[in-house]
Amino acid sequence: MSDHAINEHPSRILNTIEKIRFWKNGLAEELELLFRKQCEDTFTLQAINIEVDTQDENKIEEVRIYLSTPAFDKTILTSACITVRSYYPSQPPIVQLLDEKGGKHKYTSLLLQLWKNERSVFNIYRLVQALIKQDFEREHTSPPELPTKLVNTIEKLKVKEENEAPPVIPAKPFSSSSEQHFRKVPALPSKLPPKPLKITANSSLGQETNSNSSSFQSTLFSLNTAPFSATSQQLVHDSVSLRRPSSNIPAQKPIPPKPEQNEIIITKDTPSLKDKYSKPALLPQKPKVSKGQIVQQVSVFSTGKKIESQSLLNLIDTDIETPLKGSSELLYSEDFKPNVDPVKIQQILHKQNKIIEEKWISQIRISKNLEVKQRLLDQERHALETLAKNIENNRFILGKRRRKAREALQKLDNLKDLSVQELFIIPSERELKYYELKRKDEKLDEGIRALNQALHHESIMPASWLKGIKLLARQQFLIRDEMLQYS
């Protein structure tokens, strides 16, 4: 057989162990223990062979045990070969490590060196335990392979990322009408801070000032880009709400500086934004009736008395001011723009893939361990069933021998009661023939009882029992018929 052993079926390994039992019973028991203790997490028996040593002149038979262990997974080693010769256990076995290319590596350890001094302590199972606990040099290491579905998913994501371009952030829209309407104020250089825009107290925008011209331009942009369904009053209100001061300090009247070139000053004569964008006057609307007035009218109509307490009515009519921002600021504020980081997405994807991979590997390990445990439980159950049958057979044999011993003792007791004359009487030929037929009849009767007990314990099949009973009954009938002639 080649050095690289093929994984044999467990039944074939057990048959080989039974053959070794006729050669060396102690070695067979050690191999049986090794077969029961094997597991995929520790070691696995590949084959047990009985071979002849061709290098020896006497051609002595030897036993070779091939096994593999998870310690060989990331190395060039594939299996270990333990050779047990005829002088075992006085001499230690020979251990060789086999690699992928068919090479052999000698294995030495302290256990093998101390074997001769402590033969009663060391055995093959302890040798295998020392072998699987040793760390071997890891060569040709490679990362663990992912499942095929997960690999395909990751490759698709990589190809998709390479084909897709990075997201383009759209530039802020700008309207040319606002620049033409306000005399095309030229933009200042980016390095210099913008000049403040002065607004007088009599302007249509109220007693409010803005710190820079960029906020004023954003106000004009919100007016030009607002939805068409909104009225001009709402647009002006939204633009003013953007510049509402956070504190309640009354605004002081600013001192108007001298007008400079390219600067706009809004006065009474300057047309206001409200007049520019206002629609023609609508018809006068009817005054709205508040909820409190409706409740008061209903109570007066039903009871005839006016409600004095105005707390509930005041709560109904009161308008609660909320510090909400305008719609234009919510739509075009840079704080609300989505922030997409491709590096962070890659990190999250890698983390999720790693979690999925660990779960799959743990499930595979659990399933394999359960399969090995189930196989070992089946083997133990089969062994227990065989042991129970052997115990029943031994009980049956012991009972049979006990009955024979009891009958022999009874015969001895009967002989003790006989006199000397009766003991030394020489029987005739007729009597001897009768006694011989009687002994045969007793033996056939014992055989019939044994068959009945075996059928009761389900040790034999009913067809075999019926065949045996017919044969014994026929012989017993013939013997008893012959006994009648000599009686």
Swiss-Prot record:
GO biological process, one term: late endosome to vacuole transport
Any Pfam family hit: Vps23_core
Keywords in alphabetical order: Cytoplasm, Endosome, Membrane, Protein transport, Transport
Membrane topology (UniProt): Peripheral membrane protein
Domain SB: 428-487
Keyword Membrane: yes
The keyword Cytoplasm is annotated on this UniProt entry: yes
Location relative to the cell: Cytoplasm; Endosome; Late endosome membrane
Matching InterPro entries: ESCRT_assembly_dom, SB_dom
GO cellular component, one term: ESCRT I complex
Protein role: Component of the ESCRT-I complex, a regulator of vesicular trafficking process. Binds to ubiquitinated cargo proteins and is required for the sorting of endocytic ubiquitinated cargos into multivesicular bodies (MVBs). Mediates the association to the ESCRT-0 complex.
Oligomeric form and interacting partners: Component of the ESCRT-I complex (endosomal sorting complex required for transport I).
Protein name (record): ESCRT-I complex subunit vps23
Organism: Schizosaccharomyces pombe (strain 972 / ATCC 24843)
